[in-house]
Amino acid sequence: DYNPSGFSFHENKNRNSYAVSLSFSQVLNKKMQLSVFVDFLQQQGLLSTPYQRIYFADVADSFINEFQLADDIEQLPDTRFKIPVGARFNYYLNEKFVLRTYYRFYSDDWGISSHTASIELPYKITDRFTVFPMYRYYTQVESKYFAPYEAHLSTEEFYTSDYDLSTFDAHQFGLGVSYTDIFMGAHVWKFGIKNVDLRYNHYSRSDGLEANIVSFGMKFVLDK
């Protein structure tokens, strides 16, 4: 019979995060700007996700009809130390184009390391309208606590099957349109419209996850 006695519920439901950020920015010349940063982040408390279920390889499967019952919920350490290091480089090509690049390396004491690189090329159609194609690449090495479905053993102290903590690559392609009016000629009631931003991104991950993302934003200034 199914006996979920192995379930270890989380007594501590709190989480505290502490961060220190260091950054440096420098205008190299009339066309180039560089900025670098490093962050130190410490998390303490409940870092597991209670709805993530675990199925052990060394425990017999139990079912209710066709539904398999979990052997435990995700168990992860109650501390995590993260260090991301990155840089941004912007290059003014001409009055129409600006090249924007970004790179970040990330590492933590759960065994995850990752690289992120992105490029954006805004094109100024008019004084007010800009389009900006972009591309972002992400690659990650899995946590030492990750294993897929029915690969963990019940003797392990920590375990997760959350694929956000697995090894994967991801690509993101996008296109955006921005309207900017520093003089706020257009109004909505008592608010002057300063900026309108519309973006579409397609996200694709090597583990099969696909997403289409549309975002819309507006900046207003209250008329006096």
Predicted features and spans:
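General secondary-structure edge motif
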Residues: 4, 12, 16, 69-70, ...
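Outer-membrane beta-barrel channels and translocator barrels
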Residues: 27-31, 94-96, 126-128, 182-184, ...
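Face-selective signature of the C-terminal outer-membrane beta-barrel domain
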Residues: 27-38, 81-92, 97-102, 195-201
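Solenoidal tandem-repeat scaffolds enriched in leucines and small polar residues
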Residues: 1-53
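Generic detector of bulky aromatic hydrophobic side chains
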Residues: 1-3, 8, 19, 23, ...
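Outer membrane beta-barrel transmembrane domains
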Residues: 41, 47-79, 84-88, 107-118, ...
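Short beta-strand-to-coil "C-cap" segments at the C-terminal boundary of structured domains/repeats
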Residues: 218-224
